[in-house]
């Protein structure tokens, strides 16, 4: 990351912080809209040519940008998965019931200690996680010095989860209150990822597994994960490839936005003004937008 100052001990990002819209490249907009409506119960909020926004009736969650003929994601940096956070365990169970009723393939189901998660993919192979958090006081503390929580992976007790919706019929639409909870990225080097996301942007390290790390603001288990599971030499996402175009960090005020922007710019990183906020890129050209919520 040449030209960027060493800011290993950069000030932390302000709390409260949460994530906003996830921008995805898709190959066929009509097909993607149909998938997200049918499988996830999302609503089409707006469509303008080859761009559509979708959500659960409140704020936009996804911005889908059509690039006809875009190839599925392959072995490159970028999206591992984005994660939609449900307000309650019952809402997550309703989402699973909808997936079953629409015969949507579930790739995995995991108990992470801090949360319960369902994994699937959209038609362009973009990874999706649907999850519900356990109460914060139930999050397992880490036994490793310097780490905040323990995030493990066990098989999810699906039978117990589905007891939440015994007797209910599948619901065509997702309930309100869904937000983007976190993202997980493929990167080429975890330490370089930490130098950027902790040292430049100001996230706090929650977990460091060597081949993967998880960072957050305000003590959340993670707003972002990144890993080298595709290899340590992955390159940026090629043009005309489906995947992540941009993800969004939402700050509480314009004053906070200005402070964070000035601090990041002082490291020498290029900061581009955009729609009342700003955008920066990580070492693998993944775009991160900062805006006021």
Place the predicted regions along the sequence by residue.
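N-terminal beta-strand motif that seeds the catalytic metal site of vicinal oxygen chelate
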Residues: 1-30, 81-84, 135-191, 244-247
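Conserved small-residue-rich
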Residues: 36, 172-216
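Conserved acetyl-CoA-binding loop of GNAT-fold acetyltransferases
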Residues: 39-45, 199-205, 265, 269
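Exposed loop/turn and edge beta-strand positions of beta-sandwich/beta-sheet ligand-binding modules
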Residues: 18, 48, 78, 114, ...
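Conserved short beta-strand elements that form part of the metal-binding/catalytic scaffold
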Residues: 43-77, 127-134, 204-242, 283, ...
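Vicinal oxygen chelate
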Residues: 3, 16-20, 24-30, 83-127, ...
């Amino acid at each position: 990351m040449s030209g960027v100052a060493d800011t290993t001990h950069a000030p932390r990002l302000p709390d409260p912080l949460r994530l906003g819209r996830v921008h995805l490249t898709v190959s066929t907009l009509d097909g993607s809209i149909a998938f997200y409506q049918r499988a996830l119960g999302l609503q089409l909020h707006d469509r303008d040519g080859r761009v559509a926004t979708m959500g659960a009736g409140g704020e936009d969650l996804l911005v889908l940008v059509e690039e006809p003929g875009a190839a599925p994601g392959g072995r490159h940096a970028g999206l591992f998965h984005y994660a939609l956070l449900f307000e309650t365990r019952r809402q997550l169970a309703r989402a699973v019931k909808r997936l079953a009723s629409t015969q949507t393939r579930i790739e995995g189901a995991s108990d992470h200690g801090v949360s319960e998660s369902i994994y699937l993919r959209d038609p362009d192979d973009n990874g999706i996680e649907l999850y519900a958090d356990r109460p914060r006081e139930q999050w397992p503390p880490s036994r490793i010095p310097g780490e905040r929580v323990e995030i493990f992976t066990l098989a999810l007790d699906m039978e117990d989860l589905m007891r939440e919706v015994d007797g209910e019929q599948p619901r065509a639409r997702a309930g309100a209150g869904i937000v983007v909870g976190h993202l997980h990225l493929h990167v080429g080097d975890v330490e370089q990822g930490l130098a950027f996301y902790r040292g430049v942007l100001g996230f706090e390290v929650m977990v460091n597994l060597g081949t993967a790390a998880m960072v957050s603001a305000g003590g959340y288990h993670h707003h972002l994960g990144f890993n080298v599971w595709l290899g340590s030499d992955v390159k940026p996402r090629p043009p005309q490839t489906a995947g992540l175009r941009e993800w969004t960090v939402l700050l509480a005020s314009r004053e906070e936005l200005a402070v964070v922007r000035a601090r990041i710019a002082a490291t020498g990183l290029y900061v581009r003004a955009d729609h009342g906020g700003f955008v920066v890129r990580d070492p693998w050209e993944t775009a991160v937008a900062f805006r006021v919520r």
